[in-house]
């Protein structure tokens, strides 16, 4: 990829939405970043272009054989400064996903530079309200128009931007209801569970819909072999507080290595909490609850940062955790994490990356 980013200016700019009613993924900025790949040139022709529909061959391999990966990260505005949060980790992870699907890896530094230039162009789209952000969606898909199960020789990478509202609509964390899925599985070891590939999310929709019909917000996935060990919840990693310890399932190849998860573990340790990464069975959790040892449960991910779990149902039993209220450790981790993101707290880790004015 070239570090020089071309800029194709659009004739007129969009009217920006009311920041009081942004929601998530509903609005998109004026421009997007585009990069092409072919077997002869590699990644090339990085440019900032108007956000608009584009043509693709009906035979594009990504539509038929699933070569498609994506990422999700955010930019924040504080006192006029626009910053990214750990973007290097997202581009490392997208390369891991690309490698797993036999897709060409990207130049992480060049892509980050292109993203910074895109966000600088769209600086006025970054909302500054409490909990608001500019959601960033990089994605790569196969474009070669030929049928046949093999790796494509052509790909396109796009980065689109979407101003997003506060996940909870304010500062107060809201607990979720979780259904433990014991029929379908999300991933198996040796598969693509550790990668952020489009098919993982498509495969989760049926179980998610079934859980919603029963009155639950998300699904807690169990392992794909014995269906007894906890893996992750919905589109988030999962944490438990047992006997004052912060416990999370160890990465095993079928769990997405969340960047929020990684950050939460480091923050928890630095705040003095004991953290355990290990196998956690669903039976252990319900036994711990019966003994009064399971006091908090929460998920972690880019969208919500931290999402407290207030209700957990497995088979015919439902338990209520901490009276459906966020626990003290959950709240402390959320406040610390979002404080660093927003610039209200010191960033001693170097996680915030400023977007310069070009």
Curated annotation (Swiss-Prot):
Keyword Secreted listed? The answer is: no
Task: Write down the required cofactor(s).
Answer: pyridoxal 5'-phosphate
Say which domain of life the source belongs to: Bacteria
Q: Which GO terms describe its molecular function?
A: L-isoleucine-2-oxoglutarate transaminase activity; L-leucine-2-oxoglutarate transaminase activity; L-valine-2-oxoglutarate transaminase activity
* Database matches in Gene3D superfamilies: 3.30.470.10, D-amino Acid Aminotransferase, subunit A, domain 2
Q: Which UniProt keywords are given for this protein, alphabetically ordered? A: Amino-acid biosynthesis, Aminotransferase, Branched-chain amino acid biosynthesis, Pyridoxal phosphate, Transferase
Residues that the record marks as modified (N6-(pyridoxal phosphate)lysine) are 196
EC number of the protein:
2.6.1.42
Pathway, per UniProt? Amino-acid biosynthesis; L-isoleucine biosynthesis; L-isoleucine from 2-oxobutanoate: step 4/4; Amino-acid biosynthesis; L-leucine biosynthesis; L-leucine from 3-methyl-2-oxobutanoate: step 4/4; Amino-acid biosynthesis; L-valine biosynthesis; L-valine from pyruvate: step 4/4
The reaction(s) catalysed by this protein are:
L-leucine + 2-oxoglutarate = 4-methyl-2-oxopentanoate + L-glutamate; L-isoleucine + 2-oxoglutarate = (S)-3-methyl-2-oxopentanoate + L-glutamate; L-valine + 2-oxoglutarate = 3-methyl-2-oxobutanoate + L-glutamate
Family of this protein: Belongs to the class-IV pyridoxal-phosphate-dependent aminotransferase family.
| Free-text function comment from the UniProt entry | Acts on leucine, isoleucine and valine.
Under which name does UniProt file this protein?
Probable branched-chain-amino-acid aminotransferase
State which gene encodes it.
ilvE
């Amino acid at each position: 990829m070239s570090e020089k980013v071309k800029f194709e200016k659009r004739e007129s700019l969009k009217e920006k939405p009311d920041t009081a009613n942004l929601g998530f993924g509903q609005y998109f900025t004026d421009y997007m970043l585009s990069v092409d790949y072919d077997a002869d040139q590699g990644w090339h022709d990085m440019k900032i272009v108007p956000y608009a529909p584009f043509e693709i061959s009906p035979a594009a391999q990504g539509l038929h054989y699933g070569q498609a990966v994506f990422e999700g990260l955010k930019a924040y505005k504080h006192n006029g400064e626009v910053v990214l949060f750990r973007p290097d980790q997202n581009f490392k992870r997208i390369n891991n996903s690309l490698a797993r699907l036999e897709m060409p890896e990207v130049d992480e530094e060049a892509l980050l530079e292109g993203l910074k230039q895109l966000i600088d162009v769209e600086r006025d789209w970054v909302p500054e309200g409490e909990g608001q952000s500019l959601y960033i969606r990089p994605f790569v898909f196969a474009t070669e128009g030929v049928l046949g199960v093999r790796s494509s020789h052509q790909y396109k990478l796009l980065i689109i931007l979407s101003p997003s509202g506060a996940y909870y609509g304010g500062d107060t964390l809201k607990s979720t209801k979780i259904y433990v899925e014991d029929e379908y599985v999300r991933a198996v070891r040796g598969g693509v569970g550790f990668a952020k590939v489009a098919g993982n999310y498509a495969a989760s929709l049926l179980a998610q819909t079934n859980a919603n019909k029963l009155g639950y917000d998300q699904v807690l996935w169990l392992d794909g072999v014995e269906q007894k060990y906890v893996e992750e919840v919905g589109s988030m990693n999962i944490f438990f507080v047992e006997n004052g310890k912060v416990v999370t399932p160890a990465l095993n190849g079928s769990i997405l290595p969340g960047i929020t998860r990684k950050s939460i573990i480091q923050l928890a340790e630095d705040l003095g909490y004991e953290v355990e990464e290990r196998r956690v069975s669903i039976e252990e959790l319900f036994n711990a609850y019966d003994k009064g040892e399971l006091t908090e449960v929460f998920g972690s991910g880019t969208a919500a940062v931290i999402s407290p779990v207030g209700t957990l149902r497995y088979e015919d039993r439902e338990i209520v955790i901490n009276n459906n209220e966020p626990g003290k450790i959950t709240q402390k981790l959320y406040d610390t994490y979002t404080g660093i993101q927003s610039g209200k707290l010191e960033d001693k880790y170097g996680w915030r990356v400023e977007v310069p004015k070009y």
